[in-house]
Regions:
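Surface-exposed loop/turn motifs in large extracellular/passenger domains
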Residues: 1-8, 28-35, 53-64, 103-104, ...
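Conserved, compact domain cores that house catalytic/ligand-binding motifs in diverse enzymes
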Residues: 2-6, 10-11, 15-20, 28-29, ...
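Small/polar beta-strand repeat architecture
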Residues: 128-177, 181-182, 189
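Short alpha-helix capping/helix-loop boundary micro-motifs
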Residues: 93-107
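Ser/Thr/Gly-rich low-complexity blocks that favor extended beta-strand/coil architectures
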Residues: 105-142
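Short glycine/acidic-rich loop motifs that flank beta-strands on beta-rich extracellular proteins
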Residues: 18-24, 40-50, 59, 72-78, ...
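Catalytic cores of secreted or luminal carbohydrate-active enzymes
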Residues: 67-85
Length: 292
């Protein structure tokens, strides 16, 4: 579902599907209530990809009273997209996807007039320190780049290959009373500002249960996260692959080789009143975070 607004999906169960269960892009205000992804009795797999995926959405995302089981990919992935600077001239930025995609860029996936670009600093190409309001956006004739004219003067330190994110692609997130079990990789991937994960249970995941990761290297998924609360959750038999150690909740970042990454990226991330069973000695690791 793309370019949509005020979406409610309630009381739906998906037994099996070759692909994702529910995919949303460039959409606003999405609620899932009683959304279940579970295989039929006697089968071990439900989906070959994510149960839910939210790309460059805004407004709010709410997932409550839902179950995710047997996927070959994540229960949910909430993220924006990094744009990589190609050229700079006065108040205009020419940018491409930070991760190459063999597809044409559509105007619907680009930032909109009135949005705010998050611009990095010289010491860390992924930490936003400067902001510029978008005046206009167009797509290049070859559909491989966007041309963004800003209302504000751009800082002198901006350079080619720096990562740019969009402030509005940080929806407020509430995930409550949900269950994740028997998943090949992870549970929840969350990249946003303002998220609460409450009263959820995670069991038998191959990788970490919750991942908060700005990723400029592999997928180009943004961005730096802040004001994240994980509370009253239960984690059991998490990260059997021992990825990054036996960690259940992991905040980190992936930089492109050779680019500067001094200091932190993420803001406040808190894990409170959670129970960890068979999750390793140190089940919570918060890297590149202002309050580890």
């Amino acid at each position: 579902m793309g370019d949509s607004k005020n979406i409610l999906i309630k009381g739906i169960r998906i037994y099996d599907c070759a692909g994702m269960g529910a995919h949303f892009s460039s959409s606003e205000n999405i609620a899932l209530d009683g959304f279940k992804v579970k295989p039929r009795k006697g089968l071990w797999m439900s989906l070959t990809a994510d149960a839910t995926h939210f790309n460059s959405c805004r407004g709010s995302i709410e997932i409550i009273n839902s179950e995710f089981e047997g996927m070959c990919d994540d229960a949910t992935n909430i993220h924006g997209m990094y744009w990589q600077i190609e050229n700079i001239k006065d108040k205009t930025l020419e940018m491409s996807y930070a991760k190459y995609r063999n597809q044409r860029i559509s105007i619907s996936s680009a930032p909109k007039a009135g949005d705010t670009l998050e611009l990095p600093c010289p010491e860390n190409y992924m930490r936003p320190t400067h902001f510029a309001k978008v005046e206009s956006v167009s797509v290049s004739p070859d559909k491989k780049r966007i041309i963004v004219k800003t209302c504000d003067e751009l800082p002198q330190w901006l350079a080619k290959d720096m990562a740019v994110s969009v402030k509005e692609y940080r929806p407020k997130v509430r995930i409550e009373n949900c269950r994740v079990g028997y998943v090949r990789p992870r549970g929840f991937l969350i990249q946003t500002t303002g998220a609460v994960v409450k009263n959820c249970s995670f069991k038998d995941t191959v990788a970490m249960a919750i991942l908060i990761e700005a990723d400029l290297n592999t997928w180009g998924e943004s961005a730096a996260s802040d004001d994240i609360l994980i509370t009253d959750c239960v984690f059991e038999n998490i990260n059997s692959s021992k990825r990054n150690g036996e960690v259940a909740v992991f905040a980190s970042a992936k930089f492109k080789k050779g680019l500067p990454f001094e200091g932190n990226i993420h803001g406040k991330i808190a894990v409170k009143n959670c129970l960890f069973k068979n999750c390793g000695k140190d089940p919570v690791r918060l890297e590149y975070t202002s309050n580890p």
